[in-house]
Amino acid sequence: MESLVARFDALQEAILTHIESQDDTLESQIRYWENIRKENAIMHFARKQGLTKLGLQPLPTLAVTEYNAKQAIQIHLTLQSLLKSPYGSERWTLPEVSAELINTAPQNCLKKGGYDVSVWFDNDRYNAMVYTNWDYLYYQDVNEIWHKVKGEVDYDGLYFTDHTGERAYFTLFSTDAHRFSRTGLWTVHFKTQVISSSVVSSTNTPSFDFEEQQLPGPSTPTYTELTQASPCGRGKSRESQPTSTTSPETSGLRVRRGRRQRKSGPGPGETPSKRRRGGGRGGGETRLESAPSPGEVGIRHRTVERQGLSRLGQLQAEARDPPMILLKGTANSLKCWRYRKQNSSNCGFLFMSTVWNWVGDVSENHSRMLIAFKSPGQRDSFVKHNLFPKLCTYTYGSLNSL
């Protein structure tokens, strides 16, 4: 036990000597973290043996010593990898390779030259948040190759442009805007620059109305028209009166997908031109279904009911599949873009999927995301009024149901 205490004291002495020396080479920082690694390994071993002290040094709990030891191992290996890169010969101080800085956003990146970015919510300097950005960020890609990039700022948040040319956001101002802002607007101040909402207003999605397909019960699915645009196509809707028998894209037209209208006469209190089901959830007016035109293919988002439809009627109903857009790009750019669209006041789509990828796809832009629409017209309007992420591609498609 005395030898263990002696080794522990020697390591602590070496650590203190390094701190006082203020050496700024990466080799010296690697030696420092090697000593930290050994120190935590000894403390963890002593704690497992039931000891609470090593000499006069109290020992933390077993969980703490295990965490500190693993963290020291990770940083030690990271610095050894950095030493083999072109940036290993740069000046590196002890604070720049500290665990606290590495765990600061963006995590697992080395950082140099921090500066403040002040965000004034509602353009009020007394209602502000201060964020930290960095002149330079060092990170490893999936192939363990080191890259040096600049920390950048725009109206949305703090980011860096990775080696593929994509923006990787590590701080989004909208997160705090939901808590502190009344208007949802803010002004960004950093160094000698100011970014306000008026500067980026030209890139905002213009407001436009769109039709929505309601999701009623399975007995009487109907089309409805929005009284007001909802954030993501789930706003309050009202029934509209049938005005024609053209395609379901016509405003106010109601299309029947339930059982065929009975040939019997109207019941009490009903007119020959209108028949309402009292027991259906939707309570909508029913119309005979017509054959879909080429422009109507792709407007449905629910599975067609099997009962009460002839073979021809079922084929006609199934022809209207929900139209889709398949986005292809990097995971980070698609996630940031989806976050902005879901928090936008005018989404203009029906549903948006999470970011996913095909198993075994190792290409650079392997991530995928699906966007569903209620009609091809809504899809065309979405493409017209929205900008997709940089280097992102898209293609059209449709599904039998969602």
UniProtKB/Swiss-Prot annotation:
Keyword Nucleus in annotation: no
Region (DNA-binding domain) location: 321-402
Segments of skewed composition (Basic residues): 254-263
InterPro entries noted in UniProt: E2/EBNA1_C_sf (IPR035975), Nucleotide-bd_a/b_plait_sf (IPR012677), Papillomavirus_E2_C (IPR000427), PPV_E2_N (IPR001866), Reg_prot_E2 (IPR033668), Regulatory_protein_E2_N (IPR036050), Regulatory_protein_E2_N_1 (IPR042503), Regulatory_protein_E2_N_2 (IPR042504)
Organism superkingdom: Viruses
Biased composition annotated in UniProt, kind: Polar residues: 216-230
Family affiliation: Belongs to the papillomaviridae E2 protein family.
The name this protein goes by in its record: Regulatory protein E2
Organism: Human papillomavirus 65
